[in-house]
Amino acid sequence: MTNVLTRPRGADAAPNGPEQYPAPRYRSLLGADRSSWLYWATIIVLAVLVLAPVVPTLIQALSDRPLYESGGVFTLDNFVRLFTEADFGMVALTTLAFAGLTTILTILIAVPMAIVVVRTDIPGRRIFGVGMQWPFFISSLILGFGWITMYGPAGFVSTWVRSAVGTVPWDLYTIPGMALTEAVALAPIAYLFCANALRNADASLEGAAQTVGAGPFQILRSVVVPMLRPPVVYSSILVFSMSVETLSVPLLYGQPVGITVFATFLYKNGLQSINPDYGILGAASTIILLVTVLLVVIQGKLLREAKRFVSVRGKATRPRLLDLGWIKWPAVVFIVIYLLFGAVIPIGGLVFRSFTAFFTPLANPFNALTLANYQRIWEFPVYLASIRNSLIVAAVGAVLVSVLATIAVVVARRSTFRYRKLIEYLALAPQAMPGLIIGIGLFWAFAFAPFGLGAIVQGTLAAIIIGFGLRALPSAFGSISPAVMQVGEELDNAARVSGADWLRTFTRILSRLITPAFGAALVLSFVTMLKEYSPAIFLGSAKTNVIGTTMLELWVQGNSGSVAALATIQIVITAVFVGVAGLLMKGNKIDA
């Protein structure tokens, strides 16, 4: 049989050297082929996008005056004032308490549910598995509005409980209340990490335990739970870092009662202040950025060390479902309570609130049904514009982000570019950049861009697409990367034997094989950018508000009905898009 990888006749190579392929028959530009141009263009674009918000933030933190004033000198005084005058130390402790409690509650919710849904024989496990993922598609801002509508001091459920028993045994406007709401929003992320690990586990370990007489609960305790250590630790750090940077729940719950965390500190000092102290703002942003970068570095280290816990080998069999006996029913109740009280009731109440003039158990809400909240949205052009802007940003941004992520993945994983590892680091770097810091940093970057380019971009949808795109890029990269790594390199080699260069190999072979993964990245990026809002707080303008920033403005004005209407519209858009995308991609092997 002829070996297709045999060195071509006349190839100038050592007898035992690497395979040599025919030189691609394409023109070069300035001494570089088109593949090299793509490599360098990719790394330059990523470097500019990632460094644009970071560099101005660091410079402002070390400057004695705002960046727009000339004659500034470098100083560390901003950091000294941050901890002595701005009471940032207390803010850091509050953030630590909030993020720590959120992480604990998230793991307590997600890990048992992953074990019960994936590894046991509870009834309705498929439905519960899908239901556990849906809170991911809803922004924590909307979830926060829903919880206040139902469980806040004047919420529907709170008012009903107070009238029935005389008191309400919970208070959302506390650190535990904030942490519980955020945990409900973040539990699907930890659940997916643990569920995927359990689905891919080798059944031989459990089979060995069964042969020595171990029962279902002993197998869970001695085999299943220890295997979850890597995903639990990794997801814990991920949840902690997301809690450190989150704005929505602390802004809605904490700010009215004086509870300040990192994100609300930036929001209050950067947006709500009449005369912002940019030095304090830059120093605080730098500290928060360093914290999130450290957490991401720890994540990467733990992910590399997780190979020591590999339990999936060749010819592994899928584990059997464990019979819990009568315990399955309390487990079902636990899951139903989470889904019902954590997501269904708050979101259902928020949707119902959008169709009523008032919403309280003290009066029959069905007697107050109205479309006035939606009429208000349709009558005011600025509200309609926010919906249109969100759709444009999400649609255009999803395409741009997915294309950039695809190119970055292929260059990082399947090229010989000497800096391909740096491309991967740059593509994943934005996961360590909180949304508010991206907004603040890009605001400063646009203000000092050369040739007045920043003034053209600032306050436009293009600026928001850049900010939101940075937030979505790591997820898109992570969605496409496994698909590229699963494609055998022999396909690349065969194309190179035929004289194709790297770029043609990518466009004619790899691009077609990873189309399903590209579709998954497109859906993920669209949903992520549709529910995003924090960078737009600093990058948007009155004409470029998105749904999230408009809901915040309406909430401050006390228009809870209009907030509910906009939230419902965003939920419907997300549900329709995800549903249609699922139908279009049905039959393709996509793991989103």
Model-derived regions, located:
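Glycine-rich helix-loop "coupling/hinge" segments at transmembrane-helix boundaries
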Residues: E69, S248-N275, L362-N367, Y533-S560
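Short glycine/proline-centered loop/turn elements that form peptide/ligand docking sites
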Residues: A201-L205, V487-L491
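A short amphipathic helical element positioned immediately N-terminal to and/or at the very start
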Residues: Y26-R27, F74-F83, L220, L369-W378
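Transmembrane alpha-helical segments of polytopic membrane transport and secretion proteins
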Residues: M1-I44, Q299-I337, R418, G582-A592
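Polytopic alpha-helical membrane proteins, predominantly small-molecule transporters/carriers
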Residues: G72, A92, G213-A214, I387
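Juxtamembrane inter-helical linkers in multi-pass membrane proteins
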Residues: G71, G215, K307-D323, F358-N373
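Membrane-water interface segments at the C-terminal ends of transmembrane alpha-helices
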Residues: R34-L67, V80-R199, M227-S248, L252-G254, ...
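The alpha-helix within a helix-turn-helix
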Residues: A209-Q210, A495
